[in-house]
From Swiss-Prot:
Monomer. It is found in: Cytoplasm. This is Shikimate kinase. Binds 1 Mg(2+) ion per subunit. Substrate binds at residues 33, 57, 79, 136. It comes from Pseudomonas paraeruginosa (strain DSM 24068 / PA7). The lineage of its organism: Bacteria, Pseudomonadati, Pseudomonadota, Gammaproteobacteria, Pseudomonadales.
Length: 172
């Protein structure tokens, strides 16, 4: 089976929904950020501090390339993975891409206490999330086979909608 690749902003539910999708489809689940952390033996904020965002993005591209080279997985990506053209090409070629859309208000509510998100460890995280959404939303949509809203919806219903919509797509 072709990979299912989840993209979207932080707080959209990529990891939660990815695990449920993988269980439903009897596939492996991989979170690209967690895979990077395991490979490096360090968490994402540390990598950002030491290598900067550019260094992290290099690691991210290598990890996405590796994960997408194998079929039969559900892959949750980091929110900024779409920022590099090379990553977008890897993701499009790597499987069916599902954009989990969440409003900025829901992102704020879901990420408010999370200290593991380097881009939000600055004053005014709400404005940062709005700016990131303005920048990234067109890129998520550019590569998505399916766009699904996650606001105010239980993860199981989101999973059901994803599966129904993917079934209606023509084979690749």
């Amino acid at each position: 089976m072709v990979n299912l690749i989840l993209v979207g902003p932080m707080g959209a539910g990529k990891s939660t929904i990815g695990r449920l999708l993988a269980k439903e489809l009897h596939l492996a689940f991989k979170d690209s950020d967690k895979e990077i952390e395991q490979r490096c033996g360090a968490n994402i904020p540390w990598i950002f501090d030491v290598e900067g965002e550019a260094g992290f993005r290099e690691r991210e591209q290598a990890m996405l390339s590796e994960l997408c080279a194998t079929d039969g997985m559900v892959i949750a990506t980091g929110g900024g993975a779409v920022m590099r053209d090379g990553n977008r090409q890897i993701l499009r070629a790597g499987g069916r891409v599902v954009y989990l859309h969440a409003s900025v208000e829901h992102q704020i509510a879901r990420t408010a206490r999370d200290r593991n998100r380097p881009l939000l460890q600055k004053p005014n995280p709400g404005q940062i999330l709005r700016d990131l959404m303005d920048l990234r939303d067109p890129l998520y949509r550019e590569i998505a086979d399916v766009v699904v809203e996650t606001d105010e919806r239980p993860p199981r219903l989101v999973v059901q909608e994803i599966l129904e919509r993917l079934r209606k797509l023509p084979p690749r």
